[in-house]
Amino acid sequence: MFGKGGIGNLMKQAQQMQEKMQQMQEEVAKLEVTGESGAGLVKVTINGAHNCRRVEIDPSLLVEDDKEMLEDLIAAALNDAARRIDETQKEKMASVSNGMQLPPGFKMPF
């Protein structure tokens, strides 16, 4: 059922995967990614835990009549940053399982 090496080999692979996942999670937590909107007029930087670290707003947007547009741009930049962090996490997770013999249909926990 488990092929060469049996269940012992499977357990060894699981231990290796767990170690790699922990390392990857530590790396991702340290990452900072910047999302943008309005062609770079609004930038939001978040870390791997999706905590907002910085918001940058181009001074040209700081006019009273454009409050709603500015709010929309901030939300869009935050969503862009979150999408970028999620993509980075998926790429790193794919590298963790690369080369391991996982059962068909097995999905990573994230």
Curated annotation (Swiss-Prot):
Which residues does the annotated region (Disordered) include? 90-110
- Name the Gene Ontology molecular function terms of this record: DNA binding
**Where found, per UniProt?**
Cytoplasm, Nucleoid
Q: Which terms are listed as keywords in the entry? A: Cytoplasm, DNA-binding
Gene3D superfamilies hit by this protein: Nucleoid-associated protein YbaB-like domain (3.30.1310.10)
Q: What protein family does this chain belong to?
A: Belongs to the YbaB/EbfC family.
Q: How would you summarize the oligomeric state and partners of this protein?
A: Homodimer.
What is the documented function of this protein? Binds to DNA and alters its conformation. May be involved in regulation of gene expression, nucleoid organization and DNA protection.
- NCBIfam families named in the record: DNA_YbaB_EbfC
- Its name, as the record gives it, is Nucleoid-associated protein YPO3121/y1061/YP_0808
* Source organism of this protein record: Yersinia pestis
